[in-house]
Regions:
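ABC transporter nucleotide-binding domain
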Residues: 196-284
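Conserved ABC transporter NBD signature motif
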Residues: 79-90, 94-95
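Short, charged/small-residue-rich alpha-helical element at the C-terminal edge
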Residues: 252-326
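Conserved catalytic motifs of ABC-family nucleotide-binding domains
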Residues: 174
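Catalytic Walker B motif of ABC-type/P-loop ATPase nucleotide-binding domains
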Residues: 178-182
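Conserved ABC ATPase "signature" region
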Residues: 23-28, 120, 124, 132-149
């Protein structure tokens, strides 16, 4: 059985309609009308222990509703969720001790006190043994390089350092599952790299299962091999990022610096042009692997240098949204 099993969950929100004109508030009071929003519809997926999964989609797609159900905040109208033999909203007390949540735009740290004081409070909330807490804290301090910042009031920390402390707070009780919502929002390139490397480390060291929701596709590319795409409340794609690229982003540009001449007429060649100091090929990677193509070229000409355009993940996702009309 999978570590996370989501089966046919649905959630509809009832939203009151506002009347227009004079006495609209009074009219609404006596004759209130509603509209119904299907936030998620028949959503099903499973996740293995230790997986990092990117859960993506445009605004209003149903990502947040799904995460709130998985974290036990919301109860679905129908369907079921089993995570590590627990149902989030039924086994809430036990379940919340096994999950960590990081929201990029919301803080679980107390603003006016040092992060270490928040960590100490979380120790009591989660009832962590003194020795275990000390071990966990030292590990997080070392991995995230927190030694010089945990005694500074949170409001005085840079956004990057604050986010590192947020992640430490979410992991202080050694959760089995980590929900990350926009964990690198607003961070500079260096801070993003630190956060991503840390997520990889704790996933590898502790087999923490990670569900990542973000609009920053570079996070997805750096961390997740598998993505689940949701749009208009429905799962539209569930598979590997590499497979998605092959299906929707299959043209690759390869620029070769060489003094030799070459012309190919194979079915995988989309176009070929002479450029300054060399040749430029556009190939269809559904028909030939890049490594295989380079091996072939190397056997025919002398290569001085080579540049491979790996494609733009943001453009790929935009194209995906357009194809699915979401």
């Amino acid at each position: 059985m999978s570590f996370i099993e989501v089966k046919h969950i649905n959630k509809t929100f009832k939203v009151p309609l506002k009347s227009k004109g004079r006495f609209s508030t009074l009219k609404t009071f006596f004759n209130r009308k509603y509209r119904y929003i299907n936030a998620i519809q028949d959503v099903s997926f499973s996740i293995k222990k230790g997986e990092i999964v990117g859960y993506i989609g445009p605004n209003g797609a149903g990502k947040s509703t799904t995460i709130k159900i998985l974290s036990g905040i919301l109860v679905p109208d129908s369907g079921n969720v089993v995570i590590d033999h627990m149902t989030p909203w039924k086994d809430r007390k036990k379940y919340v001790s096994e999950i960590g949540v990081v929201f990029g735009q919301r803080s679980q740290l107390w603003w006016d006190i040092p992060a270490i004081d928040s960590f100490n409070l979380l120790k009591d909330i989660y009832k962590i043994d003194d020795n275990e807490y000390k071990k966990n804290l030292n590990e997080l301090i070392e991995l995230l390089n927190l030694k010089d910042i945990i005694n500074i009031p949170v409001r005085q920390l840079s956004l990057g350092n604050r986010m590192k402390c947020e992640i430490a707070a979410a992991l202080i009780h050694k959760p089995k599952i980590l929900f990350l919502d926009e964990p690198t929002i607003g961070l500079d390139a260096v801070s993003k790299k630190i956060v991503r490397n840390f997520i990889k480390k704790i996933n590898k060291l502790n087999k923490v299962t990670v569900i990542l929701t973000t609009h920053d596709m570079s996070d997805i590319e750096a961390l997740a091999k598998r993505i689940i795409l949701i749009g208009k409340g429905k799962i539209l794609y569930d598979g590997t990022l590499s497979k998605l690229k092959k299906e929707y982003d299959y043209i690759r540009k390869i620029s070769i610096i060489t003094k030799d001449k070459l012309e190919l007429n194979n079915e995988y060649i989309v176009s070929q042009n002479k450029i300054e100091n060399g040749l430029e090929f556009k190939i269809d990677i559904r028909k030939i692997e890049i490594n295989e193509f380079i091996k072939l070229i190397s056997s025919k000409i002398s290569i001085i240098d080579i540049d491979i355009d790996s494609g733009n993940i943001d453009e790929l996702i935009v194209k995906l949204y357009e194809d699915f009309k979401i």
